[in-house]
A protein has these predicted regions:
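Bacterial N-terminal signal peptides that target proteins for export
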Residues: 1-10
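C-terminal helix-rich "cap/oligomerization" subdomain common to oxidoreductases
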Residues: 23-41, 112-114, 344-389
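Predominantly a Rossmann-like dinucleotide-binding segment in NAD(P)-dependent oxidoreductases
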Residues: 172-253, 257-261, 379
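N-terminal Rossmann-like dinucleotide-binding module
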Residues: 23-91
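Beta-loop-alpha module in the N-terminal Rossmann-like domain of NAD(P)-dependent dehydrogenases
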Residues: 92-155
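Rossmann-fold dehydrogenase core element
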Residues: 36, 151-169, 192-194
C-alpha cells in the first residue's frame, strides 16, 4: 500500500464524504455556485425514509441543514452498530431505525425513499416500494447491470412513480454553465469532443469505512469497480449534453493497477464513445494522484474546462487566450438532490428530456456501462445497436 504523510491523508479526506463517499468534512474551497443559504421552503415537508446507511453519501442527507422541505420518518438499516454510530454523529433517534423495509412499512408509510444501500439492492428497493406508489431516488449509478435497470424501469412505469438517480455533479454550477455555453454558438456551440477525468486515489486510500468497502469493491454488489463507480459520471453528463444520443460504438480498456488492494475488480477504466459528429472519452480511476471530477468541452474552435463545481477555464480562440470563470449559482430549490426531489414531487417541476436525474438518461448510462464492460472483456470495440437494438 502507498505510504502517505498525515498531511496528505488529511488533504485527501477533507470534505469528500459527499464528493467521494467517505468522511463528511468541509470542502477545502467553498463552492459558491451552490449556496443553500438562499433556499427557503414553504409547505408541507416531503415525508421520506432512508433505505440503507452503507453508502456513505448518506452523510449528505443526515448532515443536511433542516429547512423544512423533507422530514425523515424512518431509516432501514439492519446493521444496528452502524446505525448507532451515525445516530451519535448526526443526532437522530434510534427509534427511527428499522431492520427491514417490511418493518418500516408496517409502522410508517413514507411518500418517498432515498436509497443509500448497495447498488445491487436498488432493484429490491424498487420492487418493494414502487407497487406501493412510493417515489424513489437512488445513488448513482441506477443499477448494476442492464437486466436490473430494465426491471426497475418497468416497475416505475407500471406504478407511475418517479425513479431518479443522484450524482454529485448534478449540483455543480459548472455542469449547467457548460450546457449554456454549448447551446450558445457564439461561445462553444456544437460539441466535437468531451473528456471526463473522474475518480480519486482509491477508496481504501481515502479512508472509506469497512461497510462501504465491503460492497464497493465487489463485482456483483457494485457491478464492478472504478468502471461503474466513476465511469457513470461522464456517461450521465454526456447523455444530457448530447440530448440522449446513443453512441455508435463503445471501446473500453480496464486495468488492475493495485491488485493487492482491489483483487476482485478493476481500479481503472478508459472508455471511448463514438457518435456521429462527436466523441466522448471517460477516464475513470481509483489511481489518480488526487480527487477529481473535471470535464473538458471542445467545440469547433472554442474550449471550456470545468475544473470543479465552480471554477472554469474558457478559451474562445488561440488569439484571445484563456479566461478564468466562476459558474453561476444554482437556483434555490435546485441546488441539491433532496430539494430537487421536492420540486419534482411537491411543486410540479417537469424534468427536461434526458435530465441528469431522469430515468431515461440513467437507462442510457447503464447501457453505456454495460457496453464498456463487454468491450473490456472482449478486448474490442462493440457496436451499440447490436447490444441494444
Amino acid at each position: 500500500m502507498k505510504k502517505h504523510s498525515s498531511k496528505t491523508v488529511l488533504a485527501l479526506v477533507l470534505f469528500l464524504g459527499l464528493a467521494f463517499g467517505c468522511q463528511q468534512k468541509q470542502a477545502e474551497v467553498k463552492d459558491e455556485s451552490n449556496d443553500s443559504s438562499l433556499y427557503q421552503y414553504e409547505g408541507e415537508p416531503l415525508r421520506v425514509a432512508i433505505i440503507g446507511l452503507v453508502h456513505t453519501h448518506v452523510h449528505w442527507i443526515l448532515g443536511r441543514e433542516k429547512v423544512g422541505d423533507i422530514e425523515i420518518i424512518g431509516i432501514v438499516e439492519p446493521n444496528r452498530e452502524l446505525a448507532q454510530q451515525y445516530s451519535e454523529q448526526h443526532g437522530y433517534s434510534m427509534d427511527l431505525v428499522y431492520p427491514s423495509m417490511e418493518a418500516l412499512w408496517t409502522e410508517k408509510q413514507p411518500e418517498a425513499v432515498f436509497d443509500f444501500g448497495r447498488i445491487y439492492d436498488h432493484l429490491a428497493t424498487v420492487q418493494f416500494f414502487a407497487p406501493k406508489g412510493v417515489d424513489i431516488m437512488v445513488e448513482k449509478p441506477l443499477a448494476v447491470n442492464w437486466d436490473h435497470a430494465q426491471q426497475m424501469a418497468k416497475l416505475a412505469e407500471e406504478h407511475q412513480v418517479e425513479l431518479l438517480t443522484n450524482y454529485e455533479t448534478s449540483w455543480y454550477g459548472s455542469t449547467y454553465q457548460a450546457k449554456s455555453f454549448v447551446q450558445d454558438t457564439a461561445k462553444v456551440g456544437p460539441i466535437s469532443r468531451l473528456v471526463f477525468n473522474t475518480g480519486h486515489p482509491g477508496p481504501i486510500e481515502i479512508g472509506c469505512n469497512p461497510e462501504f468497502l465491503e460492497w464497493l469493491t465487489d463485482p456483483v454488489l457494485n457491478g464492478g469497480g472504478a468502471l461503474p463507480d466513476f465511469g457513470c459520471y461522464g456517461a450521465n453528463i454526456s447523455s444530457w449534453l448530447l440530448e440522449g444520443a446513443a453512441p455508435l460504438r463503445v471501446s473500453c480498456v480496464t486495468r488492475q493497477r493495485k491488485p493487492e488492494l482491489y483483487p476482485k475488480v478493476e481500479d481503472e477504466a478508459n472508455i471511448f464513445l463514438e457518435y456521429e459528429q462527436s466523441s466522448v472519452q471517460i477516464n475513470a480511476s481509483w489511481d489518480w494522484s488526487h480527487n477529481r471530477k473535471d470535464m473538458e468541452v471542445f467545440g469547433n474552435s472554442a474550449f471550456l474546462h470545468c475544473l470543479n463545481g465552480q471554477d472554469m477555464e474558457y478559451l474562445p480562440s488561440e488569439e484571445e487566450g484563456r479566461t478564468q470563470l466562476k459558474a453561476d449559482a444554482l437556483a434555490p430549490g435546485f441546488h441539491d438532490p433532496f430539494a430537487y426531489f421536492v420540486q419534482v414531487l411537491k411543486k410540479g417541476h417537469t424534468m427536461e428530456p434526458y435530465a441528469l436525474a431522469s430515468l431515461e438518461n440513467n437507462l442510457r448510462v447503464v447501457q453505456i456501462l454495460e457496453a464498456a464492460r463487454i468491450s473490456a472483456e472482449r478486448r474490442e470495440a462493440v457496436e451499440f445497436k447490436e447490444l441494444f437494438p
